[in-house]
Amino acid sequence: SLLQGGSAYLPGRPEIQWKNLNPMQLMEELGQFTSVDGFKEMLDKADVGQAYMERPCLDPMDPQCPESAPNKQKRRVPNIAQELAGGCYGFSKRFMHWQEELILGGTVRDSQDRLLSAEALQTMFLLMSSRQLYEHFRDNYEIHDINWTEEKAAAILETWQRKFVELAQQSAPENSSQIIHAFSTTTLNDIMKSFSDVSVIRVAGGYLLMLAYACVTMLRWDCTKSQGAVGLAGVLLVALSVASGLGLCSLLGIS
């Protein structure tokens, strides 16, 4: 929850974040001023409870570890393998369950199939789409003078992903045995774009090498046994088929 930015403000309360948000307590306080029965019913159906406030802290000595954490009073570091066995739950225990296979890799188990350790841990951040981000801030007064568009929202998301990947890769200490691999949609698009870029020099050089190979292997001094023209025609046919394929993709708008 420390990595999930997001914050909200309420008069008379400290800044509300995932690491200090207790939905049940918040509903009780808001219930003194307005009816929140609908919200309570929704939270009950989703089995939210106290959200992350009732989950164990990685460091129970951390001052920000809530008193409601199960290992806060005992000051005991949690058994990570035991906590992650069978997967883990998100904000809603009913609708947000991450299976063990999705978050752990290289697992080691005992003879009774109990999880002992894992070599890899995967975490995921779900971002808004560019359309959702645009709609979310469209009526916000703070951006009324920047000509807010969906294209700008997409640019912000792309910049955020690039910065996140950069910071994630730099977060591991130099002498650490841990390796961090950060991947995002922007990274995938960059990879696809790099493979889609066509170098005219490389393509021409490749076909010249193919032409030379075909001529050398199929050309004979005896004209009756020479098939150099066949090799030349084959290379030209391949070149024309690739060119026609690229032209068709360009015509269809596929890049």
Swiss-Prot record:
Entry's transmembrane regions: 198-218, 228-248
Topological relation to the membrane, as annotated: Multi-pass membrane protein
Higher taxonomy: Eukaryota, Metazoa, Chordata, Craniata, Vertebrata
UniProt topological domain (Cytoplasmic) ranges: 219-227
Species of provenance: Cynops pyrrhogaster (Japanese fire-bellied newt)
Residue numbers on the Extracellular membrane side: 1-197, 249-255
Induction (free text): Activated by hedgehog.
Glycosylation: residue positions: 147, 175
Tissues where the protein occurs: In the eye, detected in neural retina, iris, retinal pigment epithelium, but not in lens.
Cellular component GO terms, alphabetical: plasma membrane
InterPro entries: SSD
Family from the record: Belongs to the patched family.
Subcellular location: Membrane
Ranges for domain SSD: 199-255
Record protein name field: Protein patched homolog 2
GO biological process, one term: negative regulation of smoothened signaling pathway
